[in-house]
Amino acid sequence: GYNYINNNGYGIDDDTAYNGIFDGKGHSISGLFIETKKYNKQGDNHYETYCQGLFGIIGKEGTVRNVTVNGQINAQAEGNEYINAAKYIGGIAGINAGLIINCTNNADITGLAYVGGITGQLGAQFKGSNRVSGNLINVTNNGTVTATSKSFAEAGGIVGQLAYGDITYATNHGNVSAPFKDDDMYSYLRGVAVGGIVGKDISVSECGKIDRAYNDGQIGTEDGNYFGGIIGCNYACDITNVYNTGQGIGYNYSGGLVGYKLGGTIENAYNSGEVNTHTEYQLIGSMRNTTVNNLYNIGDSTKLVALENGGDISTVYAVDTVLASDLSDAFTDSYNLPVIDWSNAPTGEDETFDIESINIENGK
């Protein structure tokens, strides 16, 4: 489905969003097929294609739970930010300012700008109101995710663009890419961002968090500026209890956990995926004025974090292996490496579910 966005004025019209409760009762929706015309003319406005997914926009009172989506979403557009079409694309929702819980996407997804396996953008600004946070809890993506813009693509296995909101218990198995290559290097200069969980967060405050998440999909952007196994570009959101085992390729700011880190925290995390980048940093491609805690890279490399303009990397380690006890109570030991303990993940069965009840910090 899609929602029309009236672009006259700042923010989204609340009456265009879904504000009900959709409970899939554990069923799958098969054969979902969404395809738009291919737009590539600069200055054209096709706002009816802006938000694509099972739901176009989930509003602040909306809940979608207990459903699996199978199919394909191909929101076609090519060019840069002046192509007003196919921008917010996700398997469950184009934009989510409500709650998505216990949902899985198996659909392959293509869009121009902000593209995620679950939602293109998390959080929103509605007209006449403050910023509204969205929440994702116990979500999984298995489909491929592709963003095609040459200047501002943000692709994530779970979320393309994190504006305001929390992600708790999230898994990405799908390949994520922003494959655009261009001779004039728009993608390098403007910051194409790709991540296993989130492409990029945009808020310098009140952004939210990523907690209990992992990626094992392949992540790549050959000419893009930011690649991270968890998040490509991290300005503000806090990250705890995460790991990456997927391989990745990036051009400039690239790392197995975070490509570019300007704010927020990251702690209790490890990477065992191979990072292919000319900078060769395995955990964080660039970090400025932030502190990290208890990070591990499994492998031979000793180039772990590119530290710029301050920060503390005293608890960053290159190791042969890691145990759950080295990380936090959020992990449990498995056959090879620690995995996140999913035994307490909310299931979405309780209609009176309280989001505040899962505000878990530091694995406690």
Language model regions located:
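Surface-exposed repetitive/solenoidal architectures
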Residues: G1-K364
